[in-house]
Amino acid sequence: MSWMLDKEIKRELPKEWRGVIPTEVFLEEAEKIVKEANARDIQLRILGGLGVAFHSQEFRDFARKLGRVGTGAIEGQEYSDIDLMSYRKHRDKVKELFSDMKYAKRRATLSSAASERQIYYHPKGWFYVDVFFDKLVVANHPINFVGRLELDFPTVTVTDILLEKIQMWEAFSIKDLKDCLILLRTHSIEEKIQKETIDANYVAKLLSEDWGFWFTATTNLKKIKKFIFEIEKLGVEVGLDPRQLKNEEVLQITEKIDKLLERVEKEPKSFKWKMRAKVGTKKRWYNPVERPETVGGFGIWETLLEK
């Protein structure tokens, strides 16, 4: 791997970590990077699971009840990298930012060029940072962030984080399920742009233009609802003790899913959407994303729920 970096990096973890990088380190470093970018007039925002954590700091107990805290690719470690989004116009400035912060840049490959991203490694080899530009292209349904980064800080909006999760068809994971449950438990569904809320209008309008995205997103939401309804039986399968969740928490989540789905269905669909709907699933409706955990299936749903 060293030959792919523009400088040599040696992995040096403090002994007291015992090989596991604390969640707080990821949160602090991500915020540090984004704040430094902001000081340089660079729009740079946190994506994914770390974004969920930033937006649910007051509900870490709920995340622990779900078994989300401390679970990741490395046993006992919650996260393995930092995902960020910026604008294409800032590419050179982003490169300069990470160079000044002593990160090592991974040399461009066909894969990184095609996915419109830059990859940087922590000065002490703790983790890598994935920076995407304008769009999240490495996705079953690419998401456009142009004009969206100014709406929140230090992360993308809660709405966009939820869309990141429910756009997955091939490899929807246990972590993604739990992140969705956290987002839905801790944020209200509103029909307007407002911080710390899920903008049902934006979701509905976006999905009304793309039948494939609509099908994947609504299927995921319905399966999340089915999971939470059958949590007594299915919870153990994902490392979740059903007794940890209160009935009102389950009810809150299901009501929010219903509200979001209702708004999505109410939105008038475009001509393009209607034409694609006639073809349905006879033709592939998502972009395949090749990665180790992707095997062409529907992630955890294949083992948890009946199709």
Predicted regions and their residues:
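Conserved catalytic core of two-metal-ion nucleotidyltransferases
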Residues: 95-140
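Active-site nucleotide-donor binding segment shared across nucleotidyl transfer reactions
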Residues: 31-82, 87-95, 157, 276-289, ...
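Short, charged/polar micro-motifs that form catalytic or ligand-binding hotspots
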Residues: 23, 81-85, 166-170
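Internal, well-ordered alpha-helical segments in soluble enzyme and binding-protein domains
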Residues: 90, 127, 176-179
